[in-house]
A protein has these predicted regions:
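Transmembrane alpha-helical interface segments in multi-pass membrane proteins
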Residues: 5-23, 27, 34-81, 95-110, ...
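Short cytosolic juxtamembrane segments of multi-pass membrane proteins
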Residues: 34, 115-130
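Membrane-interface helix termini and inter-helical loops of multi-pass transporters
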Residues: 81-87
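Interfacial loop-to-helix junctions that mark the boundaries of transmembrane helices
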Residues: 89-91
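Conserved activation segment
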Residues: 93-94, 124
Length: 130
């Protein structure tokens, strides 16, 4: 029971760090893509459209990270079972599914600030700044 709680705590910390990393990547993307966002707004994209674009990007980043994490975890479990056959190194299906869902939710929540920042950009200012 203590081991389960410890692993759960480590997983929670990992998800918090992952959320912060997704938010930082998205904030950098907003900064680097100011002109692109300005151009989209200049040709008629609404703030909602811009927000949706950044949410979609965050979902894809989070999904890719979740799937990669799942695959690496399965591979690590396999290696552990091969090295120590008597050790039950496997994750229940519900835990794997929950991990992927929580990773997606974390990514979406972490993208709220960057998506809002991108949606608030003014087209003229975004296109004129260097």
């Amino acid at each position: 029971r203590a081991l389960t709680l410890a692993v759960g705590g480590i997983a929670a910390i990992s998800l918090a760090v992952a959320g912060i990393l997704v938010m930082n990547v998205m904030l950098i993307a907003v900064t680097q893509r100011r002109k692109e966002i300005g151009l989209l707004k200049a040709i008629g994209a609404t703030s909602t459209d811009i927000r949706r674009l950044f949410f979609a990007e965050a979902i894809w980043l989070s999904f890719a990270g979740a799937v990669l994490g799942f695959l690496l975890g399965q591979f690590g479990s396999l290696l552990l079972r091969l090295a120590y056959p008597q050790l039950p190194a496997w994750a229940p299906v519900w835990a794997s599914i929950a991990g992927i869902i929580v990773a997606l939710i974390t990514g979406i929540l972490a993208s709220i600030l960057p998506a809002s920042k991108a949606a608030r950009l003014d087209a003229v200012q975004a296109l004129s700044k260097k």
